[in-house]
């Protein structure tokens, strides 16, 4: 029979914190989306890890498991009075994906290096994934709810955080949202982030609404791919954000097709040629000279015409002289 303590790799006297750490590490290790080459085994391990955590993280379930084993949970206990067992009608294990979502419900695993240690900055002010320390620790944001534990601690600055994830066949997706607002109406800021895995690539969409302006940034594997402000592509803001991130600006492809048309000056000629003043002068001289000279073929045509007219006049004179003789 499976031993849940062995599944999580903890001692029987392990604390609740030790059990959380063990589940966090193993759930991320055996998540099926992280093991596409060995998905069948990963699904089995992922399910066992979820079962072990679901039992050992709950004091009542853990007590029954310690006394009666897994059968005590499923079949309502191995003996004794029904009053000793709150699961007298049997305990049903939840879907391992639901356990995973609940555990990471207060944080978006994609907002830092996924499959690392996403809760390290929640407990005891430990160092976070980007090297910053959280002085508030677990007292400021609860590990699962994500909302302020003490609403009156910051009366002039309210913050909210929500998050959920979806573990479907199309890949691992998640969503998180934060909002900040002071006592006045002009300081509101809302930030929402959604992330999904598409063909092995992490696509992150960040939506920022501040003082009536909406800014949407789309990243692919950490590289900014597009940026819009109020629904319009903004090349200048895109380039500025790339500089801020130290990212080489990619060729900008605006979503608005009107921006693809190049600017054409009103008085610009249809064809433009580049030449210097000497060439202009030579061309002008040549043009004037050619206009003064009679082309060869035109001169021949004129000469022939004169001869024909002269011949016609001579024939007319002969006819007149002949008539006069009669």
From Swiss-Prot:
MF annotations from Gene Ontology: Hsp70 protein binding; protein folding chaperone; protein-folding chaperone binding; unfolded protein binding
One of the Pfam families matching this protein, by short name: DnaJ
Modified residues (Phosphoserine): 277
Cysteine-cysteine disulfides: none
J domain sequence ranges: 3-69
GO biological process: chaperone-mediated protein folding
Subcellular location field: Cytoplasm, Perinuclear region; Nucleus
Region ranges (Disordered): 249-326
Transmembrane segments: none
Keywords, ordered alphabetically: Chaperone, Cytoplasm, Nucleus, Phosphoprotein
GO CC field: cytoplasm; nucleus; perinuclear region of cytoplasm
Function: Has a stimulatory effect on the ATPase activity of HSP70 in a dose-dependent and time-dependent manner and hence acts as a co-chaperone of HSP70. Plays an indispensable role in the organization of KRT8/KRT18 filaments. Acts as an endogenous molecular chaperone for neuronal proteins including huntingtin. Suppresses aggregation and toxicity of polyglutamine-containing, aggregation-prone proteins. Also reduces cellular toxicity and caspase-3 activity.
The protein's assembly and partners: Homooligomer.
Protein name: DnaJ homolog subfamily B member 6
Source organism of the structure: Gallus gallus (Chicken)
């Amino acid at each position: 029979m499976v031993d849940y303590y062995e599944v999580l790799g903890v001692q029987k006297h392990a604390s609740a914190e030790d059990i959380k750490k063990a589940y966090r590490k193993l759930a991320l290790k055996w998540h099926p989306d992280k093991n596409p080459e060995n998905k069948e085994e990963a699904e089995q391990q992922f399910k066992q890890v979820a079962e072990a955590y679901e039992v050992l993280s709950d004091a009542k379930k853990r007590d029954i498991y310690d006394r009666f084993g897994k059968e005590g949970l499923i079949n309502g206990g191995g003996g004794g009075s029904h009053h000793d067992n709150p699961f007298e009608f049997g305990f049903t294990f939840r879907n391992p994906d639901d356990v995973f979502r609940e555990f990471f419900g207060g944080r978006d695993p994609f907002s830092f290096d996924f499959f690392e240690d996403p809760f390290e900055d929640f407990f005891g002010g430990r160092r976070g994934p980007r090297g910053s320390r959280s002085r508030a620790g677990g007292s400021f944001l609860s590990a699962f709810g994500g909302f302020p534990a003490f609403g009156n601690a910051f009366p002039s600055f309210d913050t909210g955080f929500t998050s959920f994830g979806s573990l479907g066949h199309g890949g691992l997706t998640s969503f998180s949202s934060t909002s900040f607002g002071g006592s006045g109406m002009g300081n509101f800021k809302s930030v929402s982030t959604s992330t999904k895995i598409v063909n092995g690539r992490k696509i992150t969409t960040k939506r920022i609404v501040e003082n009536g302006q909406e800014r949407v940034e789309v990243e692919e594997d950490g590289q900014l791919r597009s940026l819009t402000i109020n629904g319009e592509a903004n090349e200048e803001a895109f380039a500025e954000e790339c500089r801020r991130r130290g990212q080489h600006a990619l060729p900008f492809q605006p979503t608005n097709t009107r921006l693809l048309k190049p600017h054409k000056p009103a008085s610009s000629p249809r064809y433009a040629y580049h030449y210097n003043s000497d060439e202009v002068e030579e061309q002008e001289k040549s043009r004037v000279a050619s206009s003064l000279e009679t082309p060869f073929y035109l001169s021949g045509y004129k000469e022939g015409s004169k001869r024909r007219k002269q011949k016609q006049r001579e024939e007319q004179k002969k006819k007149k002289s002949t008539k006069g003789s009669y």
